[in-house]
Amino acid sequence: PISTNIVQRPVVTGVTALGLDHTAILGHTLEEVAWQKAGIFKPGVPALSVEQPENAQAVLQKYAKQVQASSFQVVPVNRDLLHVNLGLPGDHQYSNASLALELIRTFVLSDTGKQRFPGASEKLGCTGASVPDLARVALSSAFWPGRCQVVPAKEAFHATYYLDGAHTVESVRVCVQWFVRETAQNKQPKVLVFNCTNGRSAYFLLDSMLEELKKCKVDA
């Protein structure tokens, strides 16, 4: 697999939601992408993933077994997180946050984690299932410019910008859902500024956007 392997000896590895991206390198199906992404899994190292489409998840699990990862775990959404106001908008971020918590939990409970950060498991409350206070603060204050970002209107322009760097069919759908929620009470005219970089299909991205707008009963 052609995966990004910056850390040669990881303590734990994780894969977030898969989508069709960089298809010239990663492949043209979700299963091919999963195989390439699974390249970060290492022998004797726990392998984690968010819930994926069935076929893609099977590929991840197969690769984890092939390289003899110490375990393969599918991390569901942590229900306790649903009461946390995440800094990054979007329902999918609860899945990402759940994976992040499990990665941290696995790390601090490992031999390496205990050696480098003694007492961290107690401070972070990693022995329980609830979300520790420190994690709540971190997740609620997280900010990623260009991801579901709102730039408020200035008096001179009278225009509020809703920015997102979605570049896959899946992330475009999530972007539309976020935008519709954010502007539900805003009856002002809306203008779409769309940019597509080389190597991606503007047709499929825009088609996905229009489909989602129709589902949300928004005229486009």
Identify the role of each PLM range.
Residues 2-14, 18-22, 32, 81-219:
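Nucleotide phosphate-binding/pyrophosphate-handling subdomain across enzymes
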